[in-house]
A protein has these predicted regions:
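N-terminal beta1-alpha1 cap of cysteine-dependent amidohydrolase-like domains
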Residues: 1-58, 63-70, 179-188
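Amide-donor transfer/coupling interface in amidating biosynthetic enzymes
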Residues: 109-188
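Hydrophobic anchor at the start of a short beta-strand
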Residues: 26-27, 75, 166
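Cysteine-nucleophile active-site neighborhood
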Residues: 49-123
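A secondary-structure boundary/capping signal
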Residues: 8, 78-80, 103, 137, ...
Length: 188
C-alpha cells in the first residue's frame, strides 16, 4: 500500500523525500476526503503542534486517524507529531488543544528552548545504533506508561519512544541523511 503523511503544516515534504528514497509510495493528508486514499501507515511530521492539532480537528481527520492508530496502524511521529500522540502534556503546556492522545506518555513542549536552542547531536537508538539527531524547539518525554519502551535519551531526557505500532521522536530524522529511522518505521 502506501504511507500517508500529514501535510497540513510542517516538515512533511522532507519525510516524503526520505520515504521515496526507500521506495515507499506516499499520499498526502490535507483534508478529510484524503482519508479515502489507500494507506497502511502514517507520518506525523514536525512543525507546530497547536496548529496541526487544531487543523486535524477542524478538517475532520482527528477521530478517524485516532481510530486507525488505536487499531494498530504504524505511525512515525517526529517533534510536533510526538506532542500530537501524547496522552498527556506538562501542566503549563496543556491548553486543551486537540491531540490524538494514543501514546501513554507525558510530554513537555519546547523543552529544549526556542529556535536558538536548536542543536544537532548523535544518539544511541535501540534497534538502529548511533543515529544523527537534529533538535528544533524540541519536546522531550517526562514520563512513560508501562507499555512504552524508551529507545533513546539525550542529556538524561527521553527523546525517542515506542508503544507497539507507535514510534515517537523528539527530533527530526527527515533532516539528516541517515535512512535507518525511516527503515525502522517501515519495519513496524
Amino acid at each position: 500500500m502506501a504511507t500517508a503523511v500529514l501535510a497540513v503544516q510542517g516538515a512533511f515534504a522532507e519525510h516524503e523525500a526520505k520515504l521515496a528514497e526507500l521506495g515507499e509510495t506516499c499520499v498526502e493528508l490535507r483534508q478529510a476526503a484524503d482519508l479515502t486514499q489507500p494507506f497502511d501507515r502514517l507520518v506525523l511530521p514536525g512543525g507546530e503542534s497547536t496548529t496541526q492539532g487544531k487543523l486535524l480537528d477542524e478538517l475532520g481527520m482527528l477521530e478517524p486517524l485516532r481510530e486507525r492508530i488505536a487499531g494498530g496502524m504504524p505511525v512515525l511521529a517526529t517533534c510536533a507529531g510526538l506532542i500530537l500522540l501524547a496522552s498527556r502534556l506538562d501542566a503549563h503546556d496543556d491548553k486543551g488543544t486537540p491531540r490524538l492522545g494514543t501514546m501513554d506518555v507525558l510530554v513537555r513542549r519546547n523543552a529544549y528552548g526556542r529556535q536558538l536552542g536548536s542543536f544537532h547531536t548523535e544518539l544511541e537508538l535501540a534497534g538502529a545504533g548511533t543515529v544523527p539527531a537534529t533538535f528544533i524547539r524540541a519536546p522531550f518525554v517526562i514520563e512513560t506508561g508501562a507499555g512504552v519502551q524508551t529507545l533513546a535519551t539525550c542529556d538524561g531526557n527521553v527523546v525517542a519512544v515506542r508503544q507497539g505500532n507507535q514510534l515517537g521522536l523528539a527530533f527530526h530524522p527527515e533532516l539528516d541523511g541517515d535512512p535507518r529511522i525511516h527503515e525502522l518505521f517501515l519495519s513496524l
